[in-house]
Amino acid sequence: GYGMAEGLMEAGCEVVIVGTSDKVYDVAKGFCDRGFKCHGVKADFSKREQVYQGFNDCVAALGGDLDIIVNAHGIQRRHSAEVFPIEEWDEVLNVNLNSVFILCQEAAKIMLKKGYGKIINIASMVSWFGGQTVPAYTAAKGGVTQLTKELSNDWIARGVNVNAIAPGYMATEMNSALLDPENPRYQQITERIPANRW
């Protein structure tokens, strides 16, 4: 998310970043200190009312308009499928899929009126090959992939592009448990990456 926000600002966009803690304000200030136009909004996308409020706060920060939305947020919970807690399943699906639909829907209400907009959803390679000990994440990202296709079919003729990017493993905080080179899973993942690195 950080890199995508930075890239959009480097291209001249005014950007709103969303985070679950007050750290989002420090990150936004850091971008502003570098000469970018950036705003921070705090919201917990596991809570439906905060998804709507967070979206409204973002649009307000941008003066009431929206051209591009990137749904790059997500969480991860790791358990074998047979013992995966249903509460964590619900949390992951709420953040990684349900909030994506709500944000796409709310963005489209603005974009369709003006006949222009770009919606970019972050899916995952697990949408195709599955994962290990991440059934909720895999289900959610598979849902994002299919949802993106459906929304694209619905809105492209009216000027709103909807696409998904499905990156492989990235060295992020969410994957910190896998980043230890001594971890056998790290080796399995790295061996199937052509560049042999994350």
Locate the predicted segments by residue.
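Conserved glycine-rich Rossmann-like NAD(P)H-binding loop of the short-chain dehydrogenase/reductase
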Residues: 13-26
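Active-site helix of classical SDR
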Residues: 104, 140, 148
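Residue(s) in the substrate-gating loop at a strand-loop-helix junction
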Residues: 124
